[in-house]
Regions:
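Active-site cofactor/substrate anionic-group-binding motifs, chiefly glycine-
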Residues: 30, 34-83, 88
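Charged C-terminal helix
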Residues: 223-265
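Short pre-catalytic strand/loop immediately N-terminal to key active-site residues, enriched for Gly-Thr
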Residues: 178-189
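Short, well-structured alpha-helical segments that form the helix of a local strand-helix-strand
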Residues: 148-153, 210-225, 244
Length: 265
């Protein structure tokens, strides 16, 4: 395991977010907490200039409108042109036809270096993009799910980070499982979005090692949640929520090594 957190703190990479207004403050704060520099600009008049000075672009479709979609496409294509990694969070993409249409549009126009979502979101992407029908998102056949995820990563030429009770990261060849985190993280709005922002920050600082950067980012979020719940769970969800950001700010390679539960498949 590499000490990517120290690299982030020394480089202070600028991470450009076009994200949703429900969780934008938390996304900015976790980026700052781990050592990055967030900017949350979505005006179509400036996104190309902003992404041009960034080290990564995070696109999150949690709250959509037609103007923001145009900004996402413009920023994403500029990032691709400049070799800046794009991290995509297809929030709720299976919930409505509009979300599915936008996710499909973005995937067709922008190369995503990393896609971070839960299993149902990834399955919704797969149905639209590679026409694999009838996949049970709740399947207990772990081997089948792992094979599907590897196939999706190959098809999309991306690193796929699927978060849940057991997090799975694959580039189509390797597959890493992480068993950190706690179920209580689902009681706080935005932990998935925060996780995606961490992925963007880690990848921004380690662009040539995006796979390991993604793994360490997912571990960081899970471990921060575990520690915060242990320390703050009896104080209420507000303390738990803020505690996650506190623990991200205190995270280091030694904590990752001590708390990390990770294995290769």
């Amino acid at each position: 395991m590499k000490d990517m957190i120290s690299d982030i703190k020394s480089k202070k990479p600028l991470v450009h977010h076009i994200t949703n207004y429900v969780t934008v403050n938390d996304c900015a704060n976790v980026t700052l907490a781990i050592g990055g520099a967030p900017v949350m600009a979505d005006a179509i008049e400036e996104v190309e200039d902003m992404v041009g000075i960034a080290s990564a672009l995070v696109i999150n479709i949690g709250t959509l409108n037609s103007v923001k979609v145009k900004s996402m496409i413009m920023a994403g294509q500029k990032a691709n042109e400049l070799g800046i990694p794009v991290i995509f969070d297809p929030v709720g993409c299976g919930a409505t036809a509009y979300r599915r249409e936008v996710a499909r549009l973005l995937m067709g126009k922008i190369h995503m270096r990393v896609i971070r979502g839960n299993l149902s979101e990834i399955m919704a992407l797969a149905e639209e993009n590679i026409h694999m029908k009838g996949v049970d998102a709740g399947s207990e056949n772990i081997s089948q799910v792992n094979d599907l995820l590897k196939n999706y990563a190959k098809q999309w030429k991306t690193i796929l980070a699927v978060t849940g009770a057991v997090d799975k990261i694959t580039d189509g060849q390797r597959l890493t499982e992480i068993e950190n985190g706690c179920k209580e993280m689902g009681t706080v709005t935005g932990t998935g979005c925060m996780c995606t922002s961490l992925v963007g920050t880690f990848v921004a600082a380690a662009q040539q090692d995006a796979y390991d950067a993604t793994v360490e980012a997912i571990m960081t979020m899970g471990i921060a949640g575990e520690i915060s719940w242990k320390q703050n769970g009896n104080k209420g969800l507000g303390h738990f929520h803020m505690g996650i950001i506190d623990e991200i700010g205190k995270m280091n390679i030694n904590i990752l090594k001590e708390w990390g539960r990770i294995h290769e498949i």
